[in-house]
Each structure stands twice: as C-alpha cells, then as structure tokens.
C-alpha cells in the first residue's frame, strides 16, 4: 500500500497558497485492506475512506470510463493494479494531476510543473470532454488563479466549447451549477468565472440571464462602456475589491438582469429594469437553488439601486421609505451590504473605477438620524396603536430633514 498526496493540495503548496484540504490516493490496496488498517468507509460511488486519526479522505486509485450522460455517467474501476499514473490521467487539469510521496518527492507525469511555471490551465487528456462539470471547474480555477496570471490554454478552451456544443451541460444539476458559482464568488476575480464561461459559450446554457446582457446597450452618458454585459463584469470586479461578503458579490452580479429583457425599441434606456429584474432574480434563484440570504439581498439591490444612486435628489420621506423597504430596522447589516453593491455598480464603469460615491454617506447619515428617534419616546408622549408608527415616521423624517 503506497499513499500519495494529490491534486489541489500539491498544486497550492507549489504556488505557495494556503492549503485547506488534503486529498490522498492509495495505490496497491483494496477496500478490505483499508478497513483492516482502521480506515472508515464513506464513499458512495467509489471507495473513499477516512484516515483513523487525521480523518482526511483517502481514495483508492481508480480509472473511469464514460457510460452515460452528464458528470455522473461514469463507471469506476479500482483494483490493486491501478497505478498512480492511471489515477492522475483521469483528472481535469495538468496542475491538478500531480502527486507527492511521503518523502516529499513530486510525481508529475503530465507536465503540471511546466504548466504551473507557464501559468496555463491545460487539460490532462482528450477524456476531458467526458465530464461537463469540468467547464465550470476550469472557469473557477481561472478566477481563483487569475491574480497570479493564469489563463486557459487555447486547446482546452476549444474542448470546453465542444462540451457546450454536445449538449452535455444541460445534464448538470442545479446544485452543481450553484456550487461552482458560489465557490467562484470567494476568489479574487469572480468576474473571470463569468468571462471564461462566456468565452466558451457555456454562460448561455448555465446562466442565460447574465449571458443575455451582452450586446444590450446603455446610455453612453452614464455608461462609457455601453455594453450591459461588460458593465456587469466590471461591477463584479469592483464588488470583489470592496467586500469579502459572498451575498454582496452575488447581488452585484445580478443587479441589472432586468436590462436583458428591455425591448430593443426602448434601448439604450432601461426605465423599468429595477422592476423587471425582480422576477428574473426570483426564477434564477429558484432554478439553481440559491440560498435565501443571497436571493433576498439581490432582490433588495435590484429594487433600490436606482433610488440610492439618486440619494442627493431624494426627499427625506423617500429616503425613509427606501430604508423601510430595505428592512434595515430589523436587519441593520442590510444597509451596508446594499450600499456596497451600489458603490460597485457606480464604479463598474469605464474610466470611473475610482470615482467617489457620496450617496453612501448620505444614506448612512439618514439611517443614523432616523435610528436616533426612539419609539419609546413616541409611546411616552401618549400615542397608541397605528398612531405610533405614523408619529415615529414623522419624527424620523424630521430628523433626516435636519441633516
């Protein structure tokens, strides 16, 4: 029985990135031998075991053969005679197909080190096309490693386009699409995930709501970049620079989906996009099972971002109404999240990336002023029932007016 560290842990170690999960491959063993050695069986589809002490996953070396559609349509073969090289050959990218033995010796049969040095994401073998999930995984790795200068090899991009054309992407489950998108949100460059998917034609299949934004014009006066799709990528980039919050990054990426359904006769104006975008966000989130926390923030940003951009023009009553619609009295963290998305939207425009966003301060001050009005004081002054809310709002408006 030989045990090797494999995959992402080896890659990230060589890139001097933090290693969070360590996966191991066991060569020359069997399920019976693993159980006898004290390992605990956990694999449903193929033999994976937890180490008795570290609880890290150890998988028996295996090969895979395509038997059906989608990323689950594989037959696994595992046996003591499956070599480490056989196991590494079935992996997606050369930089993920390296192993390390217990003495620290690197095993790299498919040129992973060469591609690490060249900063290239390249498929290991032509069998890459058999698993549609790899399209999303490569896009995510492109986002994860973009800050180091990594790009997708042209021939790998061609294979990704081939997977898209085969129709296999349609067999990905909603959960897997969300899982990869969600992971991409935690990278330094989430916009690269969307860009790579668009470059190979996958965005139109997995996230058509975002794909249809490309080619839709906006008024050049406000949007020098003109194209709504390009604006969305720029906003995604700005949101990642402004905030580590994944719901904020998600909401920023979907805030303008309503522009994708504006009739061309109305272009470049999008007067109703804050309204039309709501149903699109609802159905997108339902389709790929986006958690409520992400959905609710996205809906709030979609509905109110245009109002917040006009903060200096709004009457005190309107500012208070917007704060109420954002539910900030019950969810005080919501305002900061929405304002971050709006700032990303404001800066996600060509040549305006470093533009200040005074609207943020205007709304924060309005919120603090309104918050300073105590409901207890209203009750103490003898107001009852519905009168309490009316008087509270009146006093809050006065507090905002006094700024």
Curated annotation (Swiss-Prot):
It catalyses: a tRNA precursor + 2 CTP + ATP = a tRNA with a 3' CCA end + 3 diphosphate; a tRNA with a 3' CCA end + 2 CTP + ATP = a tRNA with a 3' CCACCA end + 3 diphosphate. Mg(2+) binds at residues 21, 23. The keyword tRNA processing applies. Pfam families: HD, PolyA_pol, PolyA_pol_RNAbd. Keywords: ATP-binding, Hydrolase, Magnesium, Metal-binding, Multifunctional enzyme, Nickel, Nucleotide-binding, Nucleotidyltransferase, RNA repair, RNA-binding, Transferase, tRNA processing. Its cofactor is Mg(2+); Ni(2+). One of its GO terms (molecular function) is CCA tRNA nucleotidyltransferase activity. Residues 228-329 form the HD domain. Magnesium is required for nucleotidyltransferase activity. One of its GO terms (biological process) is tRNA 3'-terminal CCA addition. ATP binds at residues 8, 11, 91, 137, 140. The keyword Hydrolase applies. Belongs to the tRNA nucleotidyltransferase/poly(A) polymerase family. Bacterial CCA-adding enzyme type 1 subfamily. Catalyzes the addition and repair of the essential 3'-terminal CCA sequence in tRNAs without using a nucleic acid template. Adds these three nucleotides in the order of C, C, and A to the tRNA nucleotide-73, using CTP and ATP as substrates and producing inorganic pyrophosphate. tRNA 3'-terminal CCA addition is required both for tRNA processing and repair. Also involved in tRNA surveillance by mediating tandem CCA addition to generate a CCACCA at the 3' terminus of unstable tRNAs. While stable tRNAs receive only 3'-terminal CCA, unstable tRNAs are marked with CCACCA and rapidly degraded. A single active site specifically recognizes both ATP and CTP and is responsible for their addition. Comprises two domains: an N-terminal domain containing the nucleotidyltransferase activity and a C-terminal HD domain associated with both phosphodiesterase and phosphatase activities. Monomer. Can also form homodimers and oligomers. This is Multifunctional CCA protein. The lineage of its organism: Bacteria, Pseudomonadati, Pseudomonadota, Gammaproteobacteria, Vibrionales. The gene is cca.
């Amino acid at each position: 029985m030989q045990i090797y560290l494999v995959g992402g842990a080896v890659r990230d170690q060589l890139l001097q990135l933090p290693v969070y999960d360590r996966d191991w491959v066991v060569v020359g063993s069997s399920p019976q031998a693993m159980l006898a050695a004290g390992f605990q069986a956990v694999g449903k589809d193929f033999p994976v075991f937890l180490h008795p002490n570290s609880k890290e996953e150890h998988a028996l070396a295996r090969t895979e053969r395509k038997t059906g559609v989608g990323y689950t349509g594989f037959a696994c073969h595992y046996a003591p005679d499956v070599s480490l090289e056989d196991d590494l050959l079935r992996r997606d990218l050369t930089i993920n197909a390296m192993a390390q033995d217990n003495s620290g010796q690197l095993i790299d049969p498919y040129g992973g080190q060469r591609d690490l040095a060249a900063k290239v994401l390249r498929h290991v073998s032509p069998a890459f096309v058999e698993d549609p999930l790899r399209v999303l995984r490569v896009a995510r790795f492109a986002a994860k490693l973009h800050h180091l200068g990594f790009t997708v090899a042209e021939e790998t991009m061609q294979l990704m386009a081939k997977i898209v054309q085969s129709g296999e992407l349609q067999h990905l489950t909603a959960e897997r699409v969300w899982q990869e998108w969600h992971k991409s949100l935690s990278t330094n460059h989430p916009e690269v995930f969307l860009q790579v998917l668009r470059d190979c034609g996958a965005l139109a299949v997995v996230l058509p709501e975002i794909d249809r934004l490309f080619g839709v014009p906006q008024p050049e006066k406000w949007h020098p970049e003109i194209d709504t799709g390009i604006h969305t990528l720029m906003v995604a980039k700005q949101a990642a620079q402004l905030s580590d919050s994944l719901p904020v990054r998600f909401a920023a990426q979907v805030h303008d989906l309503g522009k994708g359904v504006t009739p061309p006769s109305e272009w470049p104006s999008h007067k109703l996009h804050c309204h039309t975008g709501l149903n699109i966000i609802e159905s997108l989130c339902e389709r790929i099972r986006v958690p409520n926390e992400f959905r609710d923030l996205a809906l709030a940003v979609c509905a109110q971002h245009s109002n917040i951009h006009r903060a200096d023009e709004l009457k005190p009553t309107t500012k208070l109404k917007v704060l109420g619609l954002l539910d900030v009295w019950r969810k005080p963290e919501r305002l900061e999240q929405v304002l971050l998305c709006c700032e990303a939207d404001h800066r996600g425009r060509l040549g305006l990336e470093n533009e200040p966003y005074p609207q943020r301060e205007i709304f924060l001050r309005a919120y603090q002023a309104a918050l300073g009005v105590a409901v207890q004081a209203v009750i103490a002054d003898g107001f009852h029932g519905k009168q309490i809310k009316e008087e509270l709002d009146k006093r809050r408006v006065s507090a905002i007016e006094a700024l």
